Amino acid sequence: MGRSPSSDETGLKKGPWLPEEDDKLINYIHKHGHSSWSALPKLAGLNRCGKSCRLRWTNYLRPDIKRGKFSAEEEETILNLHAVLGNKWSMIASHLPGRTDNEIKNFWNTHLKKKLIQMGFDPMTHQPRTDDIFSSLSQLMSLSNLRGLVDLQQQFPMEDQALLNLQTEMAKLQLFQYLLQPSPAPMSINNINPNILNLLIKENSVTSNIDLGFLSSHLQDFNNNNLPSLKTLDDNHFSQNTSPIWLHEPPSLNQTMLPTHDPCAQSVDGFGSNQASSSHDQEVAVTDSVDWPDHHLFDDSMFPDISYQS
């Protein structure tokens, strides 16, 4: 809240000074000086307050006022004094002959303050701004990461990456072709590229569904020239039957085509025995004509509790 005007200041003129008012003030000060600014307006014949006369003389009318652009030496002096004194413009102006405090303040706000900010300094402390340092640091880190990605892309182009993926998939197919298709001619495991197995193990996406024991047993069959047929692999592996009798002694055609005998099909009370007698005789005939490997069958781990009965 501003100071209320006194009775002596009531009706005084305010606003811009006229040239006639400037001449009266200059002539009076040249003749009498400015010992008392409160009594000067009445003595000089001015309808102004003492403060207005003082500011007009100090900032505009005194003969030693230096006009024009600030020099480089004056700018350096203002910066050094502001770092020590702060915004004490009157004390700064006392070290610059011919410059007023108001002129120095305006020059600071319009030029020097903006210049310090652009240079990365705090205009109040004259120290480097930490926020600019952190912002520039994040930009430098982003540029560094981008440079690393560019270098990596130059070392491994996209075409080479696509070619490597294609070679991996073809290696998988080649290995399955060796495992699943029958081979009448002798084949050595040395003919298989070892990179195929390495690529398949690294991928994990396909090898996770393959039994490693099953894979190793069939790789040994390559050297023994005992490669099983595709149907044998389907019947044994995908049905989870890995009995040694089926791996070392492939079944004959008669054994694979042999119909199974379901005990549940027999009648409990003898009902329907005549109707099933003809089909039963045929099954007995087929069974008698087939040489079953009983000594191997009951030795298998699938029949631990069944004893052979003649």
UniProtKB/Swiss-Prot annotation:
Domain HTH myb-type: 9-61, 62-116
Protein name as it appears in the record: Transcription factor MYB53
GO terms, molecular function: DNA-binding transcription factor activity; transcription cis-regulatory region binding
Localization terms from the record: Nucleus
Species annotation: Arabidopsis thaliana
PROSITE patterns: HTH_MYB
Keywords from the UniProt entry: DNA-binding, Nucleus, Repeat, Transcription, Transcription regulation
Lineage top rank: taxon: Eukaryota
GO CC list: nucleus
DNA-binding segment(s): 37-61, 89-112
Xref: CDD domains: SANT (cd00167)
Keyword check for Transcription: yes
Primary location recorded for the protein, binned into one broad class: nucleus
InterPro entries: Homeodomain-like_sf (IPR009057), Myb_dom (IPR017930), Myb_TF_plants (IPR015495), SANT/Myb (IPR001005)
Keyword Repeat among UniProt keywords: yes
Membrane-spanning parts: none
Expression by tissue: Highly expressed in roots and at lower levels in leaves, stems and flowers.
Gene name of this polypeptide: MYB53
Subunit structure: Interacts with FBX5.
Induction: Induced by abscisic acid (ABA) and gravity in roots.
Function: Probable transcription factor.
